[in-house]
Structure formats: C-alpha cells, structure tokens
Amino acid sequence: WEDFISELLVRKYHAVHLVAGHDFRFGHKNEGDVEKLRSYCAAHGLGCDIIPRVEKDGVTVSSTYIRSLLEAGEVRRAAEFLGHYFSVEGTVRHGEGIGKKALFPTANLIPEEHIIALKRGVYATRAHLPNGETCVGVTNVGVRPTVSDKNTVTIETYLVGFDGDLYGQKLQLDFFDYLREEKKFSSTQELHDMIAHNAEEAKGIVKL
C-alpha cells in the first residue's frame, strides 16, 4: 500500500496534501486504510485530511450511493446529496438534422469525459449557454428509437426558446428532474407533441 502513495500519488502526481473519506481503502488487496494513510503522511511531511462520515435522512453520503441514484434517474434526489445539480459539460456537435427538420432544433452534446451512466430517458435540464445566459432544456439521454435505428447513446437537448448556432461551442447541462422513459413513438408528429408537452413540464420545474 505504501507504493500506492509514494509511487502513484507523490512521484507521478506530485501530491503534497491528501484528502480521503473515512472508509477509504487503497493499495494491494485494499490493505491501506485511513489510519495508515494518516501515519504515512505524518512521517513524510504530507498534509492529510480525513473526511468523517456524513449522513442525510439516515443514509450515509457516499459516491457509491449517489451513482446509484443517477443510474436510477433520481437526479433530484442526487442533487440533495451532492449539494448541487448533477451536470454534464461538452461540445455541441452536428447531429443528423432530423430534429431541426421534423421536430425541434436540438443541441447534441459530446461530453468532456466519461460520465456516469444516467438512466435512459428524458430530463428537465438547465442549459448554460456560451454567452452566460441560461435557458430551460428538455434533454434525451438514449438512442432516439423513433428517428434512429442506431444503438448509440446520445445526449440531445431541445433548448426551449433558444434560436442560435452553438456548433463547436461548450454547453453545460444541469439535470433537475426525470420526466419520462425513452420510448418509440408511432410517428414524428406524436414525438413532436410529447416534446412540446415535456417542454411545458420543464418550464415549471427548472429554475433559471
């Protein structure tokens, strides 16, 4: 376990102060614990803070629990534990143009990095635009079964009331609530009507 600190954290990442949760385990076979971490730091002149257990509503706040909420689509509950809304940031890319032609214009996001596997479905979101303004968003995380036969998961957002070009620019989405599961509609008109309904729902949920 000492090599984990000396070789990885100190030598490779040049760490001078380490912060860990109360139940942190590390090293070969998880032999390292917070007491060993604290002792090592004291002996080698490194700063060290151990974060005590924190509970909310009788549940221990942990990254594992928060991930499970996000994977279940419970973004509102996750925000209570995070202290802020779960967000995704990325670059807007060109899509297939289907939304602009037959539905609503959408922003297709390439996330900055690998993100936690959010439950597929439609969310009420707040979009942070490049000019500093915010607007309500209806975000689909999924494969868009009504308009595409590809099985690639995308993050596609209808920015309510926005009319502009965001291609190649950064966009941040804050996830406020889960609206519905992704489904295949019988026609693009039916999908259009549902997106319009979801937009009205989102406007009543999202705080700008």
Indicate residue ranges for each PLM-predicted region:
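Phosphate/ribose-recognition catalytic cores of enzymes acting on nucleotide-derived substrates
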Residues: 94-208
